[in-house]
Amino acid sequence: MVKRSNSYESRAEIVSSAKRLFQQYGYKKTTVSDIAKAMGKVKSAIYYYFPDKESLLRAVIDEEIGKLIRSIKDAVERASTPEEKLRVYALTRSFEIRRLSTEYARFQEEYDQLFPLVKEIHERYDHFERDTLKGILEVGMELGHFNKTDSEVLADTILLWLKGLEAQLSSFGSEEALKEAVEHLVNVLLFGIKVR
């Protein structure tokens, strides 16, 4: 049992070190040797847990996506009404995506190289987003807060809006400006579907 714990801690330490270096130097410029050196270990210690640098990047991205999902779930669970759930979903998602795009700014320069991996991970995350939004919408419809409509189509539409906003994150100079834009977007959405 102790060995498993040490194994988990070693793996987590490697992922944490890789994350720091990927953020600082980008994926392309970070080597497995750099990661090992930053930890005071040899390369073979990294390869014991990860067969290559890409699998290490996958672990880093999976960890970040896990944090993103937990943040969104926690925020949505704390909200009491379907309207508030939509609002906190959109705000939390936008702030977390902004945080990630800032922390991993160097990845934008390497996007073409990383596209296949990013696309695969994005597709998994899209399922979570679609299911979460669909659930919020369906509860809102059942409670009579939202007009009855195709929740799947509406969830996809909301995601398109949020992704459009996501593409423009760098144009918002402050978190307050981003919050205001998200609030406007949610208000347009709510007053378009809210039962009067």
Task: For each feature predicted by the language model, list its residue ranges.
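Amphipathic, non-transmembrane alpha-helical scaffold segments
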Residues: 15, 57, 61, 65, ...
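N-terminal intrinsically disordered/low-complexity leader segments
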Residues: 1-9
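Short coil/turn segments at alpha/beta junctions that flank glycine-rich nucleotide-binding fingerprints
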Residues: 24-28, 79, 100, 143-144
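Hydrophobic alpha-helical connector segments
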Residues: 59, 63, 70-99, 155-158
